[in-house]
Amino acid sequence: IDVFIMKIEPNIYITYEMVFSDEPLPISDYLKELDKNWLIRFALFIIYSGGKFKTLNNYVTTFFCKQNHDFVKSVLDIMNNHYAKTLNDPTNIIPRTYFILSESTGLELLKQIFSISNFTNVLPQTTQEQYLFKAILLINSNISETNVLEEFDDNKNFTNLYYAKSLVCNFINNHERLNLKSEFISVLQIIKGYYFFKFCEKSKLQPHLTQFLKNNGFQSWTQYLYNVIQLILYPLKNENDKFPVIKLNERLEGYNYLHAHSFSADYVIPTSENCDYTFFKTYPLIEIDKQTFLPINAIFCINHLYRSIYFEFNKINASFDNSVKIKGFSTYITTEFSEKYLFYKFVKNTLYKQRGIKLTGDDCKKLFPKKDKEPDFYHRDGNNIFLFENKDIKINKDVLNGKDYNKIGDELNKKLVRKVGVDQLVEHIKAIDARNFIWDKKLPKHPRIYPILVLDDSLLCVPGLNYILNDALQSQLKKCDVKTKIYPLVVIELDTLISYATYFKTGKIHLKKLIEDY
């Protein structure tokens, strides 16, 4: 199954320090000398280019005029020397590919553009091209910077754990945009949006749904989903090889909805308000005039099908009085919807063709109401035991953007390891090994345990994470001297169970075989 196979390309951003030895100006000082409207379109062009101008050669031949020949030649000579040194460095075991532009570069450029209040645009074209180039290299320096403490084995080589931590720092908060197709994400968001609204109809979220629809000007949630699907079709069907433009007819049909999810091209957004592109995610459209809107990127539009809805509902909940307000709103969503509604539904579906015991966390609670820390889902088929833990967590955006593994690791330990997630799995494994697992009185003599951690947020399921969490699990098990056969921990996105729901239910694929192959 493709979802379990990941090709990791060792791509390296070309940064300012690689090309220039002088002290740079702030990024804003370079960009403010260019035309804002042109810069906006350039950034969108890069975001939607699909890597067309990824290499330095493609960039300089496309975006520099002939009058900048000497400048371009100097840059290419410097980078060719850098490539040669890297190639001859015996410590670089894996060949590296250098690039200058990515979707992340374009998004960060757009964020910088909208943080500037005044543009002058008086410099000659040659200088403007050089300034833009320098700004891009500085942006690359910012987005590629990571902080991972080096770890060595007995042979003075980097440990696998060090490589795993480095991968997490490089991919986290970027992975979804760079590695998954927008069409794939769209389908998943539609499915989850559908189930979320169905859940709202028969839960404490009924008044929240009513207010949400009122705020967005719709009579029903099906109408809302229809309009959002129309919105995401614009960036998805972008066929002009530039960037999508939404043009309304003279009657301005759809204007109110688009306007509610947009901001003016003249708007100034301080970077503190757009950390992790929070502002862009809330308002994924740039309004040029009443007929013209520019989608910032496909994913931000797609997320209005489901992911962004949480934040709108949270604001609505905060505005209610105590008679309607849900205390502990985030916990309510993660427990009642994410776990007991969505997770239960799709794990049951995944195991539909399997025989044996299948117990949700609620089932376990009913069996022993006074017993705490029941498994989120337990399944035994013969000697094979599948222990599931489900986590719908959010990592602080400042921690994600900082790309400092000390801080990222602390967050992962707090939310996925200590007393939760991994530690919960270890406790259940110890109970099974000691034959005092109260939820299954007929444990086999020689069980085989498959520990599984299901994450709701696909942004967290990045290369390296599974290795880190399994390392934590194995370290705990060594301390406990467990005798039972334990397979390595597998981290699975809930999206995977949703994507292959039909295949699981019909028995065309089986979880046990997928895990063993993985």
Where are the model-predicted features located?
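Long amphipathic alpha-helical coiled-coil/heptad-repeat bundle
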Residues: 2-237
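Aromatic-residue detector
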Residues: 8-44, 54-55, 67-70, 74, ...
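Proline-rich intrinsically disordered, low-complexity coils
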Residues: 10, 24-26, 90, 95, ...
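Interfaces and regulatory segments of ATP-dependent nucleotide/adenylate/phosphodiester-chemistry enzymes
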Residues: 143-354, 471-518
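Catalytic core segments in nucleotide and nucleic-acid processing enzymes
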Residues: 319-518
